[in-house]
């Protein structure tokens, strides 16, 4: 396997990550722009205002992508404690002054912009956990560090936000597993996380009722708990092989709530059919594969840990979003990375992909602030 990895030019891996990111972003902008009409009444925005807001976050995300692509390992190391501290403080602020929507308190408003700190926390864990593990490498200290990262996860579960909690947990587990945490510690933490997740579901009436109705009940109210999933399935099914086309999609009539966020893949399935969904899934498989290649080619452990965490992050969110759209997984509010409309999520997704492209191009985070693309390694030449 290592011989196969060695034959792939790191610069090409980086270009593929950048290209896959750009194509998925373009798909998302196109589909969201066609879908947003029925949701404007809920947002209180005009179409122009909504598109300007979407454009603002995309531009901010592209700036984050560029900054993360150029950042060096020493620079990121200096910024990491600040990033983690700010993200935890923002989560605390949500519990005190956050805005509540549909029973969940996940957002804070700053200067007219609504931000979701739990999204920032994903990025913080992805860079802070590897940094802390390398700084305090003893296994005992590593366990304490992981428990400290779970403080933020606890805040997220109390919002409540089951989907983000799952993704943060998977990021942490993948990083700790790759680092080599003892299995008994890892198993104990997984058990605690599982109990906490089940307890969180039990505390959320709407989530508990939705899961019971969909998976354990012989009848599910088509106008209640099963409404979103049913409408999502109807949309995907009506798309057939090649889709109805944008002009005839039922999603434009407002039948499917949150079509531009949680259920964007259903809109793609209805408008462009199985062919469209397959292309989008293929693009994600392409992107995730080369993100994984970036991790495998990284020459230093911190870069590999960041790349593993970022790959699991994007892959888990894509899988959960698609699974919830077809009713395999409970609806948790996880957006489809780069494709769904999202402010904070868009920025941090582009940021972590910028880091992955950086790691791919340099076989690890670049050591200086200057752009330094590697030449073909000796092992690649000999193979």
Which residues fall in each region the model found?
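Cytosolic juxtamembrane amphipathic/interface segments immediately preceding
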Residues: 1-10, 45
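A juxtamembrane structural motif centered on a specific transmembrane helix
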Residues: 1-4, 319-383
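N-terminal export and membrane-targeting signals
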Residues: 8-21
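Hydrophobic alpha-helical transmembrane segments of multi-pass inner membrane proteins, especially
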Residues: 18-34, 38-230, 266-324, 351-355, ...
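Glycine/serine-rich anion-binding loops at beta->alpha junctions
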Residues: 111-121, 158-160, 240-245, 334-348
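Transmembrane helix boundary and interhelical junction motifs in multipass membrane proteins
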Residues: 161-166, 244-249, 259-261, 278, ...
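TM-adjacent membrane-interface loops and short helices in multi-pass inner/ER membrane proteins
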Residues: 217-261, 272-276
């Amino acid at each position: 396997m290592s011989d196969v990895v060695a034959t792939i030019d790191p610069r090409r891996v980086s270009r593929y990550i950048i290209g896959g990111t750009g194509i998925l972003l373009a798909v998302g902008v196109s589909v969201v722009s066609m879908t947003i009409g029925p949701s404007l009444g809920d947002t209180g925005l005009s179409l122009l205002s909504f598109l300007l807001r979407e454009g603002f976050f995309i531009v901010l995300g592209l700036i984050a992508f560029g900054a993360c692509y150029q950042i060096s390992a020493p620079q990121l190391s200096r910024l990491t404690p600040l990033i983690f501290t700010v993200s935890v403080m923002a989560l605390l602020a949500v519990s005190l002054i956050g805005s509540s929507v549909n029973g969940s308190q996940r957002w804070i408003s700053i200067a007219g912009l609504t931000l979701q700190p739990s999204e920032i926390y994903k990025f913080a864990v992805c860079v802070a956990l590897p940094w802390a593990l390398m700084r305090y490498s003893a296994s005992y200290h590593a366990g304490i560090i992981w428990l400290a990262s779970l403080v933020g996860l606890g805040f997220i579960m109390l919002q409540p936000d089951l989907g983000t909690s799952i993704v943060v947990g998977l990021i942490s587990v993948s990083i700790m597993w790759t680092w080599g945490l003892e299995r008994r510690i890892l198993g104990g933490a997984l058990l605690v996380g599982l109990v906490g997740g089940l307890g969180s579901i039990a505390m959320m009436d709407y989530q508990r009722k939705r899961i019971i109705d969909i998976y354990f009940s012989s009848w599910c109210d088509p106008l209640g708990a099963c409404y979103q999933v049913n409408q999502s399935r109807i949309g995907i099914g009506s798309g057939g092989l090649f889709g109805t086309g944008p002009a005839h999609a039922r999603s434009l009539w407002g039948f499917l709530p949150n079509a531009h966020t949680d259920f964007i893949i259903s809109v793609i399935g209805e408008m462009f059919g199985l062919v469209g969904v397959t292309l989008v899934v293929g693009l994600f498989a392409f992107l995730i594969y080369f993100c994984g290649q970036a991790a495998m080619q990284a020459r230093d452990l911190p870069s590999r840990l960041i790349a593993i965490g970022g790959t699991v992050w994007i892959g888990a969110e894509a899988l959960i979003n698609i699974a919830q759209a077809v009713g395999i997984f409970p609806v948790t509010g996880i957006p489809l990375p780069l494709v769904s409309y999202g402010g904070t999520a868009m920025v941090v997704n582009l940021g972590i992909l910028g880091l992955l492209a950086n790691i791919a191009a340099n076989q690890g985070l670049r050591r200086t602030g200057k752009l330094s693309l590697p030449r073909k390694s000796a092992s690649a030449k000999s193979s």
